[in-house]
Amino acid sequence: MAMKRAKVVFTCGISLLALCAVAAVFGTTNTIGQQGKVARVDWMSKLPDSTEISQLNIPGTHDTLALYGLADFSGQCQSLDVKQQLRIGVRFLDVRLKQIGNKLRAVHGFVDQKESFDFVVKELESFLKENPKETLFISVKEDDKAESPAFSFEECLNTYLKDEFWYTSDTMPQTLGQVRGKMVLLTRYDDGNKGVNMADKWQDCGSFSLDDFYIQDEYIIDDIEAKKAAILACSEKDSTYRLNFFSGYFRKGFPPSNAPSVAKIINPWAIKALPQMNKRGVCLFDFITSELMDAYFGGQA
């Protein structure tokens, strides 16, 4: 969640901890990745190079690196580290960072995640070296602003973007063959000049169109049934690409930032609902599990 939105909620009297709460493959028909036997660690290797990115179903995680919370109830969104997530099939990573000097560090709002981006990138590069036919989609967001930085956020990010591993065009790749063994960069920070820019038109807490994308990110939840309806509605949209966030927090919950509160309801529901969703797009989950991945891939082993 953006630092701006965190400040707004905080000034409204809701603890910033609430914003650290626990809290789709792209396309219109999206049948690829649902049928047949798929080995999760290299499931993309079974697909032809000609596979259109817009026809893929891609499982992802919201706040991918948020393994730690404040006082054990705020900030954590995942229980599996990035290496474990990749091995069970996750391919869209929602990365939240803070600039410290000329380096980047994983955060969720103001909650430090005890991980440097240097280490994370090495893990991602290592995975792609071992699985060169896979592709990762990396959304990078500046989740906490640095105080009077000597370098811009993107200048720091550029030091991590090796051409060997990164696809940094401002348009989405057309086919899987274009980006095998690479990370496709999507950006959610101000004044970005690399990657697919999502920041300029991103709306806070809603369902909206953004260029070729349709995005459902209704993260403030008063009615869990309304959240389910928003997820299902997103899955039926005819946009070229879809990002469908299954994550969120209860505005009126107590404590308001209780990390597993939404996931405890949404994830079991998703396990039943996902096999019926033909057009999944990119689905981003809190507390991803192998059971969720089984449902996402239609019960494949």
Outline where the language-model segments fall.
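Long, acidic (Asp/Glu-rich), low-complexity accessory segments flanking structured domains
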Residues: 23-88, 92, 101-130, 135, ...
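Hydrophobic membrane-insertion alpha-helices, especially the h-region
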Residues: 12-24
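N-terminal Sec-pathway targeting helices
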Residues: 1-15
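Active-site groove signature of glycoside hydrolases
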Residues: 99, 132-147
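Conserved, mostly hydrophobic/aromatic
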Residues: 96, 138, 185, 283
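Surface-exposed substrate-engagement region within the catalytic domains
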Residues: 164-275
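An acidic- and aromatic-residue-enriched active-site/binding cleft used to recognize and process polar
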Residues: 97-100, 141-143, 190, 288
